[in-house]
UniProtKB/Swiss-Prot annotation:
Its cofactor is [2Fe-2S] cluster. It is found in: Mitochondrion matrix. Essential for the synthesis of various steroid hormones. Participates in the reduction of mitochondrial cytochrome P450 for steroidogenesis. Transfers electrons from adrenodoxin reductase to CYP11A1, a cytochrome P450 that catalyzes cholesterol side-chain cleavage. Does not form a ternary complex with adrenodoxin reductase and CYP11A1 but shuttles between the two enzymes to transfer electrons. The gene is FDX1. One of its GO terms (molecular function) is metal ion binding. The keyword Mitochondrion applies. This is Adrenodoxin, mitochondrial. InterPro entries: 2Fe-2S_ferredoxin-like_sf, 2Fe-2S_ferredoxin-type, Adrenodoxin-like, Adrenodoxin_Fe-S_BS, Beta-grasp_dom_sf. Residues 1-19 form a transit peptide. Residues 26-130 form the 2Fe-2S ferredoxin-type domain.
């Protein structure tokens, strides 16, 4: 009898979880290299790289290393008021950002920024071009 009860409750709990998660979604606006606005949603705790990948956003070359801090292709530029609220940058992220194209004072790597509810409806800008830090490393190994 208890096995039957578990089977009938399981779908209810899954649908309840789905309803909660859709309400908890955070909207992020990306301005791509062409100046087009791409809007996507993610869950609290998702990285901005996760949001781009899971929503199949068309941002060429974004996240080439899949979030392993081995490139700078997920480089994003934040508005000042959002940048000031981001968690502290690590030395590893700073090293990768040093190799990023179009570095600004409000640049961060999308793979290192996790969504919080306070970020709902934020807009981030993708730089005009991308530099893949892995290629720079590969080139220096060959010389």
């Amino acid at each position: 009898c208890s096995a039957v009860a578990v089977r009938t409750l399981r779908p209810l709990s899954l649908s309840a979880r789905a309803a909660c998660s859709s309400e908890d979604k955070i909207t992020v606006h990306f301005i791509n290299r062409d100046g087009d606005k791409l809007t996507a949603k993610g869950k609290p705790g998702d990285s901005l790289l996760d949001v781009v990948v899971e929503n199949n956003l068309d941002i060429d070359g974004f996240g080439a290393c899949e979030g392993t801090l081995a490139c700078s292709t997920c480089h994003l530029i934040f508005e000042d008021h959002i940048f000031e609220k981001l968690d502290a940058i690590t030395d590893e992220e700073m090293d990768m950002l040093d190799l990023a194209y179009g570095l600004t004072e409000t640049s961060r790597l999308g793979c290192q920024i996790c969504l919080k509810k306070s970020m709902d409806n934020m807009t981030v800008r993708v730089p005009e071009a991308v530099a893949d830090a892995r290629q720079s490393v590969d080139l220096s190994k060959n010389s």
